[in-house]
């Protein structure tokens, strides 16, 4: 099993593993990957059986878009067996929602209780432009199917100045009307960055909150879900809104998560290039304490924090790898 507890060199307990099952996606969101992205050869991607061998207690499945991975239903069924046997405590999914309608019922039957769905706009034309060819009605259908199957849905919206800053109220209203939690996320300097784009689009979440407060009364609720979000309750609706602010409110000192790419690289920080390659040991069938030693050694090297930053005229700490590679 994954060793528990895990502690890095700065005394932070690491309790949360995000596992990317694929770098492939049926969309090309401009802040996530290049339009002409080259995907990994399939023989470099960990098999689902190799991922199963990790033996984690809490697992968030990400991508790319995890639901485009061939055989993903079988993987979730295996994870469901672990849940029922008490070998896994929690199984969740982050998705763009386009394939969710076809999978929602089976995900619920496997023991998934909640899903995070990326939704940066409610406008079909803008959605197609942001994703480069996506159809927003597929996402709406996926959310409806997930809720019909009994899954709790949280919406993740990237705050993009000049792109969706005119929809903050609309997104909040839509989330409330459809009984979804909503989390706003600051734009990070990752992947392909056309000249000036990230500087122009970066919108500090303090400004987003201030904008929301011109219409809503937001109450800090002190909720701690073990992640980086700061939560408020909207007094008028009772809904929950989260703010993930890796730049304006750096949360590195309490970071408790690591990411495993579909290639087997363990990244202990989104904003640093250092990683540990677990693919050789997973492919060799290493399990138990031997695997735990490899993971402990990797987590001991977790850096103090990221180097992201936006200046008046420059972007600092850019990570060349895209989010589809690292795992969203």
Swiss-Prot record:
Annotated binding of GTP, by residue: 18, 60, 94, 154, 257-259
Bound cofactor: record note: Binds 2 [4Fe-4S] clusters. Binds 1 [4Fe-4S] cluster coordinated with 3 cysteines and an exchangeable S-adenosyl-L-methionine and 1 [4Fe-4S] cluster coordinated with 3 cysteines and the GTP-derived substrate.
Catalytic activity: GTP + AH2 + S-adenosyl-L-methionine = (8S)-3',8-cyclo-7,8-dihydroguanosine 5'-triphosphate + 5'-deoxyadenosine + L-methionine + A + H(+)
Residues binding [4Fe-4S] cluster 2, per UniProt: 252, 255, 269
Pfam families to which the protein is assigned, alphabetical: Mob_synth_C, Radical_SAM
Ligand binding (S-adenosyl-L-methionine): 31, 64, 118, 188
Listed cofactors: [4Fe-4S] cluster
Entry's Gene Ontology BP terms: Mo-molybdopterin cofactor biosynthetic process
Keywords in alphabetical order: 4Fe-4S, GTP-binding, Iron, Iron-sulfur, Lyase, Metal-binding, Molybdenum cofactor biosynthesis, Nucleotide-binding, S-adenosyl-L-methionine
MF terms in GO: 4 iron, 4 sulfur cluster binding; cyclic pyranopterin monophosphate synthase activity; GTP 3',8'-cyclase activity; GTP binding; metal ion binding; S-adenosyl-L-methionine binding
Binding-site list for [4Fe-4S] cluster 1: 25, 29, 32
EC numbers on record: 4.1.99.22
Matching InterPro entries: Aldolase_TIM, Elp3/MiaA/NifB-like_rSAM, MoaA, MoaA_NifB_PqqE_Fe-S-bd_CS, MoaA_twitch, MoCo_biosynth_MoaA/MoaC, rSAM
Enzyme class: lyase
Subunit structure: Monomer and homodimer.
Miscellaneous notes: Seems to be specifically required for the biogenesis of DMSO reductase. PubMed:10411269 shows that MoaA contains a 3Fe-4S cluster, but it may actually be two 4Fe-4S clusters as was shown in the crystallographic study of the protein homolog from Staphylococcus aureus.
Function: Catalyzes the cyclization of GTP to (8S)-3',8-cyclo-7,8-dihydroguanosine 5'-triphosphate.
Family: Belongs to the radical SAM superfamily. MoaA family.
HAMAP family xrefs: MoaA_B (MF_01225_B)
UniProt protein name: GTP 3',8-cyclase
């Amino acid at each position: 099993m994954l060793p528990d507890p895990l502690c890095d060199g700065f005394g932070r307990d690491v309790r949360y593993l995000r596992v990317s099952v694929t770098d492939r996606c049926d969309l090309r969101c401009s802040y996530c990957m290049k339009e002409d992205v080259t995907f990994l050869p399939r023989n470099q991607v960990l098999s689902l059986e190799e991922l199963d061998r990790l033996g984690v207690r809490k697992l968030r499945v990400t991508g790319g878009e995890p639901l485009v991975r061939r055989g993903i239903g079988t993987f979730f069924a295996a994870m469901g067996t672990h849940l029922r046997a008490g070998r896994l405590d929690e199984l969740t999914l982050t998705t763009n929602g386009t394939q969710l309608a076809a999978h929602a019922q089976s995900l619920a039957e496997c023991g998934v209780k909640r899903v995070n769905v990326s939704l940066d706009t409610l406008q079909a034309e803008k959605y197609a432009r942001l994703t480069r060819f996506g159809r927003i009605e597929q996402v709406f259908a996926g959310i409806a199917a997930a809720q019909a199957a009994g899954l709790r849905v949280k919406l993740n919206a990237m705050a993009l100045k000049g792109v969706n800053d005119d929809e903050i109220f609309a997104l909040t209203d839509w989330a409330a009307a459809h009984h979804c939690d909503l989390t706003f996320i600051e734009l990070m300097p990752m992947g392909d960055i056309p000249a000036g784009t990230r500087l122009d689009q970066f919108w500090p979440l303090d400004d987003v909150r201030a904008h929301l407060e011109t219409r809503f009364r937001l109450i800090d609720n002190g909720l701690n879900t073990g992640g980086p979000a700061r939560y408020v309750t909207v007094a008028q609706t009772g809904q929950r809104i989260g703010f993930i602010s890796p730049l304006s409110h750096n949360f590195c000192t309490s970071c408790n998560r690591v990411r495993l790419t579909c290639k087997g690289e363990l990244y202990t920080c989104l904003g640093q290039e250092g990683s540990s390659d677990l693919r050789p040991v997973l492919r060799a069938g290493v399990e138990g304490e031997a695997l735990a030693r490899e993971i402990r050694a990797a987590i001991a090297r977790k850096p103090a924090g990221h180097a992201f930053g936006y200046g008046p005229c420059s972007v600092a700490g850019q990570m060349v790898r895209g989010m589809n590679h690292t795992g969203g």
